[in-house]
From Swiss-Prot:
Database matches in PROSITE patterns: RIBOSOMAL_L21 (PS01169)
Protein's name in the database: Large ribosomal subunit protein bL21
One Pfam short name: Ribosomal_L21p
Origin organism lineage: Bacteria, Pseudomonadati, Pseudomonadota, Gammaproteobacteria, Alteromonadales
One annotated Gene Ontology cellular component of this protein: ribosome
Keyword RNA-binding belongs to the record: yes
SUPFAM superfamilies: L21p-like (SSF141091)
GO molecular function, one term: structural constituent of ribosome
């Protein structure tokens, strides 16, 4: 059984037991989170596709950890002007483990 749900403006395909990195959620480590924006649920032969959401669909997950991704380097450069600017960005994430998928 797997599901596609939406969180943080992105869609994630998950099954029970999977660990997924999502955009940062303001939830403490060890707590459970419910995602109700379920777009698709597939269980063996049957596939429930929402229009746009599956009615009664829910993905339950447990927050494993919070952290930051690897640094992305940004370089701005102006030719012939002896001007360059180097910056970096590290995005916060929340790692969750999927515990249940309900259709």
């Amino acid at each position: 059984m797997y599901a596609v749900f939406q969180s943080g403006g992105k869609q994630h395909r998950v099954a029970e037991g999977h660990t997924v990195r999502l955009e940062k959620l303001e939830v403490a480590t060890g707590e459970t989170v419910e995602f109700d924006q379920v777009l698709l649920v597939a269980d063996g032969e049957t596939v429930h596709v929402g229009a746009p959401l599956v009615e009664g669909g829910k993905v339950v997950a447990e927050v494993v950890s919070h952290g930051r991704d690897e640094k992305v380097t940004i370089v701005k450069f102006r030719r012939r002007k002896h001007h360059d600017k180097k910056m970096g960005h590290r995005q916060w994430f929340t790692e969750v483990k999927i515990t249940a998928i309900n259709a």
